[in-house]
Every structure is written in C-alpha cells, then in structure tokens.
C-alpha cells in the first residue's frame, strides 16, 4: 500500500517504514485492547501506521505536527486518536467533522475505524490540501473530504449538518462549545480531547453549555501508554443556542463567552417582561 508523489510521503522512505511497521505491528492493537478495551483489526492497524508514516514524511517539509518520530506518533497520535472511537460510535449516524485537524488526527484514524463520511477542517488550507493525497492512497477518498477555512465560515455554509465533531488540542472547552453549536444537528455530539483543563476552564464551559444548547454526556479520564493523561468530554446538542451563532470570525477565542453574559441577558429579558 501507499505510494505518494513529490511531497515525499511513503514512497520516499519505504524501507524505513517497513522496518518500523514490523517492529510496532501488533503493539498498537495490544495497547488499545488491554489498556482501553478497544479492538481493531490487523488491516486497520496497518492503515493507521501507513497514515502516520505519510504524515511524518510530509512533516519534513511542512509543519503538520510537532511530533517527529513514528515511535512517539504511535502513542501521541494513533493511540490518542483512537481513544475517541467509542464516543464517536455512540453519536447518531451521519456526517463526522474533525475541527482543527492539523495533521489529520484524530480525523483520519476515526474515518478509517468508523466508516463515517468525514470532513477534515483546518484554517490553514495548505495543511488540509496536503492530507488529500494521503486519504486517497489509504482508500478513503470516497468518504473523506477537506475544508480549508474558518469554522465560523463553515457554520454559515453547512449549518446543523454534522452528527458528531471532534476537537483535539484546539481551544478552550467554552470556545469549542460556541464553535460547534451551529454546526451540530439536534442530538449531535461534540467530543473534546483535553490534557489537563484548569478549573477555570471547566467552570466557564459548564456555565455556558446550556445556553449554547448542550448537555454534558460524559467526562472520562484515560492514561496513555506513555503515562500521560487524556480527558475526553462529550457534549450533546439538546436545544438551539440562546444567541445567534456563529459570531464573527475569531470572536470565540478573542472575546470568549462567559456565564455572566447569559445571566445578564436573562436579567434583561426579565426586566422587559416586568
């Protein structure tokens, strides 16, 4: 499998890739099964390693990821990405989007394992364009596409089209809730991968989730095989947001919504009713 062209993916270093894959084949499956209770096939594992190798090769000429070795990538990209599989599978049937996909993680692995129609989203167009030939060579071209642009613009173009979204190391939970709300249909889910969110971040997110139309489905902690901790938060779209979304591009990060914003709006409405 896997022959790429001049951007220097798998074809440029096939011997090294085969050697690395021979060393690690089976290891990822064992880790996922024993540590996380997730089963994948040998063929799926091979596709995931081909994906990782392709991204590592592209990364030599384009900054897709800060992780520079396939050994580290097996844990910090593949194992980490696949942690989201049960949560994505629990979401309603339909379109899956990976927000801020970067090097295609967790989007490509979850496309491989779920079989869902998938959209990889990143504001840097050249990043998602670099992922397109990778997807083709992995046999995902019929169900995986890319969007190079801002999430707010995507929400205007494709409102309420998504059944499930993922976001890994992209922004604060509160900002992610705001960005995801206009994209998700009712009943859709947002799966957020976080390392160690602060109490302040959690307080803000939990304080604005209901006004944005969400309810918390789960907050799970996982330990990766390198000893690091990953928390996965899953929010379900239960209602329409109380405010018009999306706001202008960048507002979710530059001027994030706070619980007090909605308390003030409720107070203003109460005064008007009185």
Predicted regions and their residues:
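Short "lid" loop at the C-terminus of a central beta-strand within the Rossmann-like core
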Residues: 172, 195-199, 223
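Class I SAM-dependent transferase core
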Residues: 2-8, 13-97, 126-142
């Amino acid at each position: 499998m896997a022959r790429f062209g001049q951007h220097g993916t798998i074809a440029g270093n096939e011997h090294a890739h085969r050697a690395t894959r021979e060393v690690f084949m089976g290891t990822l499956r064992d880790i996922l099964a024993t540590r996380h209770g997730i089963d994948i096939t040998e063929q799926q594992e091979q596709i995931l390693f081909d994906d990782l190798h392709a991204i590592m090769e592209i990364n030599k000429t384009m900054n897709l990821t800060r992780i520079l070795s396939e050994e580290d990538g097996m844990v910090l990209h593949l194992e980490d990405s696949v942690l989201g599989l049960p949560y994505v599978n629990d979401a309603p049937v339909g379109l899956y989007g990976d927000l801020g996909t970067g090097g295609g993680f967790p989007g490509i692995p979850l496309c491989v394992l779920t079989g869902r129609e998938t959209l990889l989203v990143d504001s840097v167009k050249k990043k998602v364009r670099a992922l397109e030939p990778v997807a083709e060579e992995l046999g995902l071209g019929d169900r995986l596409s890319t969007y190079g642009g801002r999430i707010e613009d995507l929400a205007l173009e494709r409102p309420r089209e998504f059944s499930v979204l993922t976001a890994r190391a992209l922004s604060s939970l509160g900002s992610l809730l705001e960005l995801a709300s206009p994209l998700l249909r009712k009943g859709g889910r947002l799966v957020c991968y976080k390392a160690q969110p602060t109490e302040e971040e959690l307080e803000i997110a939990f304080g604005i989730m209901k006004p944005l139309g969400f309810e918390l489905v789960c907050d799970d902690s996982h330990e990766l095989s390198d000893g690091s901790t990953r928390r996965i938060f899953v929010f379900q779209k239960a209602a329409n947001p109380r405010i018009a979304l999306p706001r202008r591009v960048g507002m979710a990060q530059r001027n994030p919504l706070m619980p007090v914003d909605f308390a003030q709006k409720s107070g203003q409405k109460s005064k008007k009713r009185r």
